[in-house]
Structure formats: C-alpha cells, structure tokens
Amino acid sequence: MRFVFIIALLLIGASLAHPADPIRAKRDVSASEDEFSGDSSGEISGESSGEASGEASGEASGEASGEASGESSGETSGESSGDEETSGEGSGEEGSGDTSPVVPVDELTLQQLETLNTYAQQVQAESQKLIHQANFVITEMTALSANAQNLGILSNIVLANSQMVLDSARLSLNETETETGTSAPATCVSSAVCYGDSGCGSGKCIGALAGTCNCNSCVFGWPCQEDSACGGFNGACNSITATCDCFAAYTKNNLTLAEALTSFCNVETCNGAEDNVEKCHGLPCNYGFCVC
C-alpha cells in the first residue's frame, strides 16, 4: 500500500509541475503520436514485408520444388521408359534369335515371282498328265483282266475238247492194235502212253518206263548228232552244242517264227513221205499236215 501511495503522489506532483507549458505538452502528445504511428507503421510494414517476402519465398520455393520435382519425375520416367525400350529391344533380339530369319518380300523381284508361278503351272499340268495316264493304265489293266478271264474260260473249253479228242484217239488206237495185232501206230497221238519211240509213230516217247508221246518232231534242246534226231528238220541239229535248235532251222528254211507258227507247223498240208522234203523241209507228215 505504501508503495502505491508513493507512486500516486509522484504522479500528482508531475502533473502540477508543468500545467502552463502547452507547447511541451503538445510536443509530448505529438511525440507519443509519432511513436504510436512509428510503431504501427513499423508493425504494418513489417507485417506487409513479411507477408510479401513469405509469399515470394513460397512461390519461389513452390516453383523451384515444382520444377525440381517435374525434372526429376521426367528424368525418372525417361530413364524407366529407356529401360523399358532397352528391355524391349533385348527381348526382341532374343526372341528373333530363336526363330529362323524371314526373308523380306521386297527382295524377290517380279520376274522371279512370275518364273515361280510358271513353274508351278507346269508342275500342275504334268501332274494332271500323270493322273490321266494312271487312269488310262487302270482302264487297260481292267480290260486285260477281263480278257484274261475270257481266255481262261476258252482254255477250259479247248482243254475239254482236246481231252475228248485224245480219249477218242486212244480208243481208236487200241482198236487198231487189237485188229492188226501190232503195237506200232502208223501216226503219232499226242500224250499217248508209250514205252518207246516206236509207240509214237513219227513222234518221240518222253519219260522213263511208261512215258507219253510228244508229237513235235523237232524238240528244242533234244540231244542229236544229225537232223534225223530232230524229226528230220533240215538244219535243226546244232553240231556245236549237239542239240536240236528248231528256231535256227526255221531261219535256214526261209521262215520267220511268226510264219512257222501260223502258216507252216501243223498247217501246211502234205500227202506222205514224198512231200516231207519239199513241203515239210524234212519233217514228218502226220494226219496230212507237216508236224513241227
């Protein structure tokens, strides 16, 4: 309390000591106003400068940080894309290394393509020809098979007829032997049972013990010393091989093989022994025909 009382007395004394000095009071008031304005202007200028500097620094820092972050992100993305391109190129090179190289189409000229096309058409035409030829061969084979079947049927008929003729000839031979009492037939009967050449007339008895008559007078490859062993065929006995060569005899007597088979052997007519040399070239005359 004492301290407060002392302060109050000092204030009262000060106010009473200078009441008549208005200039000084005005000076004091203006000084206080100046201090107040200085303080306020300082505070305002400080605040404005602080805000301006803060905004400038904020914008600068923002732009700097934005540019830095943009550049860093751009560089990072560029590097990553570069890495991806590098990896893509690497994978592409590795992948292409695994497969065979592909020749670009533009390396082939138009002339080469036309040549290949022409060659392909030729191959196709040749294949069509081969197909037609194969079809023709198949058709011919079918026709030959049918003809062979027909020939088989005809051969069976001929065999049956020949068997009938053979049986009739054997029967007539047996009757002749019974009537004449001789076993030597005047003529040769093909495939007749024989025990020697005498039982085959002009033919030969082929086979051991009971053989069969071979009425072919000239037997190819039959051993001989002269033409008489070859059925009397002129020039049939080959002196070098000592065997009968009937085909050479045809040539020596001016006959081709076709002529001998179609117009001479068993076709040329004869009357007997007197015709053997002229018409039958030494071969026997059997049943009125020259027998080869």
UniProtKB/Swiss-Prot annotation:
* Acidic residues composition bias: residue spans: 81-96
**Which segment of the chain is annotated as a signal peptide?**
1-17
Residues of the region (Disordered) are 28-103
Carbohydrate-modified residues: 174, 254
Q: What is this protein called?
A: Chondroitin proteoglycan 3
Q: Where is the composition biased (Low complexity)?
A: 38-80
Q: Which key words are in the record?
A: Glycoprotein, Proteoglycan, Signal
